[in-house]
């Protein structure tokens, strides 16, 4: 596994469906109805039910964890939520496409990986990055 600056990580595609949102709500104790109730989501101006921001963030971090082989090697992770992932109530759900690239090599044995997560061709996370221990 190369961790040189410029290395592109293998792309990751994750499909989120409504049942994933319900399971995540139970695990996170975030039962905000915008994540499961269409009527509520639309009443607050959303186009439909949306994925939890933290679920989207977790999905995006998988690209780094799978690349490095040890989720514990991620020593820092951050992002801002740029736009929602709308999850329709159908068999297809929402497809989140994740790409990442090593952008900096630090002297302490870590590298910075910039991450992009996109839904419907548009980024959903802003400034997403992970600092990863590689040695």
What are these regions (language model features)?
Residues 1-9, 90-135:
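HotDog/MaoC-like acyl-thioester-processing domains
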Residues 14, 84, 107:
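Residues that form or immediately flank small-molecule/cofactor binding pockets and catalytic motifs
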Residues 13-15, 80, 131-133:
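Generic structural detector for well-ordered beta-strands
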Residues 1-51:
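Catalytic strand-loop segment that frames the active site of acyl-thioester-processing enzymes
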Residues 50-56, 119-123:
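Noncatalytic linker/hinge segments flanking ATPase motor cores
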